[in-house]
């Protein structure tokens, strides 16, 4: 575990402070990123990309900027934001093997409109 805030932010940030920059690059509608997954409910999402791992890392770095990150081996990173939101990135998900970012707002004091969701980054002809 390093010291300071993710991305060398000078301040401990909440998820709501990162929505605008993240949503300028990734589809964001009604508190959810990406598209509805054909195999899940509204909280299971997917973003299609020609380089799904690089896209997942970019998304995670933007949405978790300014949080406190802990690394767990080579597969998982967990970031706690100032508002209590927990953002987890796994390089390989347990369900389908794709990279996944989980946004958990259960303990958030101010999620800034973001809803609880799990986003799978799927290899394809996306951006």
Task: Locate predicted features.
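Low-complexity, glycine/serine/proline-rich disordered segments
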Residues: 1-71, 103-127
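Amphipathic, interaction-prone secondary-structure segments
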Residues: 72-94
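Histidine-centered divalent-metal-coordination microenvironment in nucleic-acid enzymes
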Residues: 76, 97-104
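Solvent-exposed loop/turn segments at secondary-structure junctions
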Residues: 93-96, 107
């Amino acid at each position: 575990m390093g010291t300071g805030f993710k991305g060398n932010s000078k301040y401990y940030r909440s998820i709501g402070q990162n929505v605008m920059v993240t949503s300028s690059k990734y589809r964001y509608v009604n508190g959810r990123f990406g598209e509805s997954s054909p195999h899940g409910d509204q909280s299971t999402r997917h973003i299609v990309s020609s380089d799904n791992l690089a896209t997942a890392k970019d998304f995670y770095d933007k949405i978790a900027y300014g949080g406190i990150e802990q690394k767990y081996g080579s597969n998982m990173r967990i970031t706690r934001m100032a508002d209590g939101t927990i953002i987890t990135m796994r390089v390989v998900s347990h369900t389908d093997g794709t990279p996944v970012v989980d946004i958990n707002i259960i303990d958030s004091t101010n999620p800034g409109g973001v809803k609880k969701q799990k986003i799978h980054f799927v290899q394809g002809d996306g951006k």
